[in-house]
């Protein structure tokens, strides 16, 4: 097992390198970098379709004093669109500040060296370290990921067991219909539907539309703080849990059905064991292997992929919304740092998931690839 863990840890190096290399190459060919973002704001031009969405985050950059170098000369030429009216020296100053005065391979190597030391630098437009930004946004995304995963498991496992025990019944058929319909609805579309129905859209005004807590949260008694916290989380968690709920329920059902049909179940029943004794004394442990072992990866999936659109729709200031705004604003330090952190956590959690299999079922041996 130790050799397997070491191999997996060593395999993380080329995996992380490949992820960062692909992202870096894609960014090099993407139109509109941070320099063009600043130029567009100084000249009043539009850099693309996302400029109206990305907000005014570039305004903070202009307040640093670089805007004073934006003197106009008629003869200036530049590789940047909209920069013909700006001083070339000012353009060079922008390139130096953003690090684009160096060739791409040198910038990539420097980025990898800094990331190995967990030095992610500062945001281009917020004048705050990337780690500080991540620490500020992490609690929101953690709250969504943890509660969504727990809710999914608490409902899906009992429901999946019930469906397996009543396989082919009316209960199994209508619950499967509801689950499939729920799985087919995209999470962001379901979130919008919840807002329309329950957040003051057109029908009921039962839940808040935005934020993780109320503005007067610090003034509330402790028990009211808890209620207010879950009041704000209700709709986002339901929207995120829809697709995961369907997947986990069907996975649990199929796992139990596979175990129930095995020979040892018939042997246990022949020895006089009751239905519950067979189910919870023999079947449950084996059937729950794949379900429990998948908990870390399910949490990471909810934490990283499910929260992006949900945080944006419900205006929750978490890592998903931070990454979305950073991509629009071409805030590359934040984009690459969040990608690096998410990818690193992802590969580590995948290793933990594999090790969880061996902890639940010692018969599994990754060295020989046998069970």
Residue ranges and their predicted role:
Residues 12, 137, 141, 177-180, ...:
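Residue-level signal for discrete positions within transmembrane alpha-helices
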Residues 5, 9, 90, 94-120, ...:
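Hydrophobic alpha-helical segments of integral membrane proteins
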Residues 1-29:
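Internal alpha-helical transmembrane segments
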Residues 69-74, 82-85, 89-157:
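An internal, D/E-rich "acidic patch" concept
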Residues 3, 47, 62-85, 158-182, ...:
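Cytoplasmic juxtamembrane interface segments
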Residues 2-3, 138-139, 143, 147-171, ...:
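Alpha-helical transmembrane segments of integral membrane proteins
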Residues 23-29, 92, 179-211, 232, ...:
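Membrane-water interface segments at the C-terminal ends of transmembrane alpha-helices
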Residues 18-103, 202-225:
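Hydrophobic alpha-helical transmembrane segments of membrane transport/permease proteins
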């Amino acid at each position: 097992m130790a050799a397997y863990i070491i191999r997996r840890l060593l395999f993380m190096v080329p995996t992380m390198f490949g992820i960062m290399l692909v992202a870096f190459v894609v960014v090099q060919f993407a139109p509109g970098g941070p320099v063009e973002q600043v130029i567009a704001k100084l000249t009043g031009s539009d850099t693309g379709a996302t400029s109206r969405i990305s907000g005014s985050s570039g305004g903070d950059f202009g307040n640093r004093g670089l805007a004073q170098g934006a003197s106009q000369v008629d003869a200036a030429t530049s590789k940047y669109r909209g920069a013909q009216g700006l001083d070339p020296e000012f353009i060079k100053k922008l390139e130096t500040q953003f690090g684009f005065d160096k060739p791409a391979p040198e910038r990539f190597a420097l980025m990898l060296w800094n990331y190995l030391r967990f030095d992610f630098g500062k945001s281009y437009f917020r004048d705050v370290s990337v780690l500080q930004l991540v620490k500020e946004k992490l609690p929101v995304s953690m709250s969504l990921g943890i509660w969504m995963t727990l809710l999914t498991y608490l409902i899906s496992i009992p429901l999946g067991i019930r469906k397996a025990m009543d396989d082919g019944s009316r209960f199994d058929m209508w619950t499967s219909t509801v689950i499939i319909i729920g799985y087919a609805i995209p999470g962001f579309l379901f979130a919008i539907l919840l807002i329309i129905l329950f957040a003051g859209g057109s029908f009921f005004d039962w839940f808040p539309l935005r934020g993780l807590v109320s503005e007067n949260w610090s003034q509330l008694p402790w028990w009211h703080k808890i209620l207010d916290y879950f009041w704000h989380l209700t709709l986002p968690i339901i929207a995120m849990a829809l697709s995961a709920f369907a997947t986990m329920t069907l996975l649990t059902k199929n796992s139990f059905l596979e175990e129930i049909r095995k020979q040892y179940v018939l042997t246990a029943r022949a020895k006089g064991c009751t239905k519950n004794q067979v189910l919870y004394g023999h079947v449950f442990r084996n059937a729950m292997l794949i379900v429990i072992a998948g908990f870390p990866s399910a949490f990471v999936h909810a934490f990283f992929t499910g929260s992006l659109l949900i945080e944006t729709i419900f205006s929750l200031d978490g890592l998903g919304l931070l990454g979305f705004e950073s991509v629009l604003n071409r805030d590359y330090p934040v984009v690459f740092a969040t990608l690096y952190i998410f990818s690193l956590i992802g590969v580590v959690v995948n290793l933990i998931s594999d090790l969880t299999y061996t902890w639940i079922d010692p018969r599994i041996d990754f060295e020989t690839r046998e069970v």
